[in-house]
């Protein structure tokens, strides 16, 4: 088996802002596995707060590249297990290799992944389209640019309720909210009570990941699923 890789800095169509900051590009690693002339592709993004940049993925991959190329590829699950032990501290790289392994296996068997897994895609849940924090008129324009049945709206500002109030005027689609840990418990409850009357379906990551007491408080009182 042969392996190739390439790094990209993918430019977003629009700047993407959440409560932690703004991104205009996404650093990404693409890997290619080739086995008897058939190629499979996988990718992994670099997310800053996980401290695993693309450069680290490449460095780790280079140190064990020969082991991957010597692997006798017959089963993607076995390949994942092998990669998991090769790179125990780099789950993003393992993910890219795992995706490439499944893509390769599907092409070898001439089957789509859902066929390999025995899935009925007619029952797939609908994914949401994410809109980052911006001036509210820009957020409205993004909704109009991409009509969608479910929107995830990034929040974490002093004007969160006003933003959702305005967006609701322009769509009847389901709205989900992701605060990316921007709120405190009391603030979150106040906002969630307002969102309940604006047709919001659920709230994602309202509080800091280690605020267990706040989550306990909010879970008992929130009128919306968390």
Pin down the residues of each PLM region.
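Flexible, glycine/charged-enriched surface loops at secondary-structure junctions
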Residues: 76, 113-114, 202-206
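Metal- or metallocofactor-binding catalytic centers and their adjacent structured scaffolds
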Residues: 33-34, 39-108
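Catalytic core of soluble alpha/beta enzymes
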Residues: 153, 158-226
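Structured beta-strand/loop patches that form or line metal/cofactor-binding pockets in enzymes
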Residues: 1-50
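Conserved, mostly hydrophobic/aromatic
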Residues: 31, 37, 97, 110, ...
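Active-site mouth loops of central-metabolism enzymes
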Residues: 123-135, 154, 180-184
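Catalytic pocket of metal/acid-base enzymes, prominently hydrolases
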Residues: 105-129
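Short, acidic/polar
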Residues: 132-146, 158, 186-190
């Amino acid at each position: 088996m042969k392996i190739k890789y390439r790094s990209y800095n993918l430019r977003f169509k629009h700047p993407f802002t959440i409560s932690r900051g703004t991104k205009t590009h996404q650093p990404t690693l693409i890997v290619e596995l080739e086995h008897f002339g058939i190629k499979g592709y996988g990718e992994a993004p670099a997310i800053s707060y996980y401290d695993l940049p693309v450069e680290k993925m490449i460095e780790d991959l280079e140190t064990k590249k020969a082991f991957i190329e010597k692997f006798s590829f017959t089963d993607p699950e076995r390949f994942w297990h092998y990669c998991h032990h090769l790179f125990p501290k780099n789950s993003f790289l393992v993910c890219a290799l795992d995706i490439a392994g499944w893509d390769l296996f599907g092409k070898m068997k001439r089957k789509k992944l859902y066929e390999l897994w025995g899935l009925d895609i007619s029952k797939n849940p609908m994914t949401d389209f994410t809109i980052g924090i911006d001036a509210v008129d820009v957020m409205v324009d993004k909704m109009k640019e991409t009509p969608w049945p479910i929107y995830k709206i990034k929040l974490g500002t002093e004007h969160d309720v006003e933003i959702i109030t305005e967006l609701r005027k322009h769509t009847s689609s389901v709205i989900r909210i992701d605060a990316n840990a921007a709120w405190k418990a009391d603030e979150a409850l106040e906002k969630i009570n307002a969102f309940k009357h604006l047709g919001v379906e659920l709230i994602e990551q309202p509080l800091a990941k280690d605020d267990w007491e706040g989550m306990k408080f909010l879970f008992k009182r929130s009128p919306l699923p968390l």
